[in-house]
């Protein structure tokens, strides 16, 4: 991360269409090193700005600072059920063990997805089993992924085309396309890391029921 902070001024963003999305996405970037130090890299006035990201969550809009401030509206969320309250002479009982999550936003805007991802990121159980941790990462992504037809943009379906998790110590990407529940692993070996040009990796497309 320290090396990134020193060299980010030498990085230029290319105005080039993403062949999968067929647009030039207004991307913000989240970067984590092997120590767990996480930063956000966001464009501002033609420059890339590196910001410490202590919640370790990011969406493309608005800026990270706005999302952090917005979390104050959801400070009441908790995994335990809310306590019973005596209102006058009436004991108002909590509705169940899930009641602590009442108010967790359920929409697909970036602001709502940021809150959901932050809540799950900081409350899902961690494990010494890396396979379990990997699956938990995909559970978080499931909660913020947009299904086909749920959101339309000018009549066209706007949906999450793939999910991706990176294992920073192993330097491997795990990818789940929209039409498959199978994970595809791409190992970042020295050959890939030394390439100067964009590299595409193919995979075998499976039918949904497979």
Task: Describe the predicted segments one by one.
Residues 1-54:
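Structured, non-membrane catalytic/scaffold regions adjacent to prosthetic-group chemistry
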Residues 32-36, 44, 101, 120-122, ...:
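Short, flexible beta-strand-to-coil junctions
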Residues 38-80, 101-104:
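Phosphate-rich cofactor/ligand-interacting catalytic cores and adjacent structured alpha/beta frameworks
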Residues 74-124:
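Long, charge-rich alpha-helical interaction segments
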Residues 104-175:
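Extended, compositionally biased non-globular segments
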Residues 172-197:
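C-terminal soluble interaction/assembly domains
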Residues 200-202:
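Acidic, proline/serine/threonine- and glycine-rich low-complexity intrinsically disordered segments
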Residues 204-210:
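Conserved small/polar residues in nucleotide/adenosyl-binding loops
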């Amino acid at each position: 991360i320290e090396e990134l902070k020193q060299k980010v001024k030498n990085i230029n963003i290319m105005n080039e269409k993403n062949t999968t999305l067929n647009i030039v996405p207004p991307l913000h970037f989240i970067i984590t090193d092997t120590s767990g130090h996480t930063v956000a890299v966001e464009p501002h006035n033609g420059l890339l700005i590196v910001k410490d990201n202590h919640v370790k969550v990011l969406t493309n809009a608005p800026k990270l600072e706005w999302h952090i401030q917005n979390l104050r509206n959801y400070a009441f969320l908790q995994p335990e059920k809310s306590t019973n309250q005596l209102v006058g002479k009436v004991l108002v009982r909590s509705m169940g063990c899930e009641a602590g999550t009442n108010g967790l936003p359920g929409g697909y805007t970036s602001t709502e997805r940021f809150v959901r991802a932050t809540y799950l990121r900081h409350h899902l159980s961690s494990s010494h089993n890396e396979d379990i941790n990997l699956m938990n990462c995909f559970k978080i992504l499931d909660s913020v992924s947009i299904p086909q037809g749920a959101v339309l943009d000018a009549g066209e379906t706007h949906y999450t085309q793939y999910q991706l998790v990176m294992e920073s110590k192993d330097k491997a990407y795990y990818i789940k396309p929209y039409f498959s529940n199978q994970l595809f692993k791409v190992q970042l070996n020295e050959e890939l890391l030394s390439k100067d040009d964009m590299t595409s990796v193919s995979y075998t497309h499976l039918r949904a029921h497979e």
